[in-house]
Amino acid sequence: MKLKINFVDFWPSFDSRCNFFIDILSKKYDIEVSDDPDYLIYSIFGYENLQYDSCVKIFYVGENITPDFNLCDYAIGFDLMEFGDRYMRLPYYVLYDIEKLATPEIIDPETVLNRKFCSFVVSN
């Protein structure tokens, strides 16, 4: 199945052709980034999303900002809230390397003890 999607109003370094949405969706769908999308994924860094009316709008935010469901059909965000099937909580840290998080680095106790580190905790 082919999905036509577009990304607008993301941070300046966001790559619309190589990102976590493309990585996830391309496992099941044939993805085409298009100026005439069926699905628009947008964020908080602009107002270009207001120019799109004939597509499904999905709001994505990694910050603690509550989605306005008058402006979007679905939302993916940080807030701990429920809005039926229209909202999915996806904290920003989930997008980090899962393998690296699942297999923490093993720390050698000898290395920790022999690093000549000193710390003070002061309270008045």
Where are these regions (language model features)?
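Catalytic core of nucleotide-activated saccharide and alditol-phosphate transferases
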Residues: 36-124
